[in-house]
């Protein structure tokens, strides 16, 4: 579920243009990201989008994630992202009992995914040719790294049945004619074509 959360969060960052621009003006960062999202949406509707880069900085992205404009799946709270060259690190507090609701497993390896945990996820992410790509490098629960094969079991059991396009490696269409997305130091740069 952490993988799903990271994937979802990464998609939010890269796909910020897909979000609606609400009137919640609780911070300058949120107001700024809402203006940029509105620009991306409007630019994406034109016959020839302006290819000038749109840069979303980390403070804007995190203000957006903390706002009521993003609805995370049940059990996922306090999401925060940090960007570096080509990589994203995400943190969240996750109640796995809520995340796994309705799906049970007798596999003892999956028992670590129960209760409330602080989750850290590191991933590589980029967009090219209108497609977004995410590869989850590692997931830790309360500072303890989850072995990759256990993470894969979790994804197969709890993520893929509900979200078949999300996994350790994910590929998805970028919205609003976004052609490329580059994660940089504390920012993501989006170019439309």
Q: What kind of region is each of these model predictions?
A:
Residues 7-17:
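Bacterial N-terminal signal peptides
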Residues 2, 18-20:
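A broad helix-preferring feature
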Residues 20-193:
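Extracellular/lumenal and peripheral-membrane lipid-interaction modules
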């Amino acid at each position: 579920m952490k993988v799903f959360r990271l994937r979802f969060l990464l998609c939010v960052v890269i796909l910020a243009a897909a979000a609606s621009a609400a009137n919640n003006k609780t911070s300058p960062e949120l107001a700024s990201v809402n203006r940029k999202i509105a620009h991306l949406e409007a630019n994406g509707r034109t016959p020839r989008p302006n290819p000038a880069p749109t840069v979303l900085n980390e403070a804007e992205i995190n203000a957006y994630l903390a706002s009521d404009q993003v609805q995370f799946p049940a059990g996922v709270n306090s999401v925060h992202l940090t960007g570096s060259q080509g990589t994203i690190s995400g943190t969240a507090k996750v109640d796995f009992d809520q995340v796994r609701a309705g799906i049970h497993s007798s596999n003892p390896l999956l028992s670590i995914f129960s209760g409330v945990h602080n989750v850290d996820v590191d991933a590589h992410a980029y967009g090219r040719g209108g497609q977004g790509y995410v590869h989850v490098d590692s997931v830790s629960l309360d500072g303890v790294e989850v072995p990759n094969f256990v993470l894969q079991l979790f994804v197969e059991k709890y993520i893929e049945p509900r979200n078949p396009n999300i996994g350790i490696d994910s590929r998805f269409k970028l919205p609003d004619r976004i052609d490329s997305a580059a994660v940089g130091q504390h920012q993501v740069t989006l170019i439309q074509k």
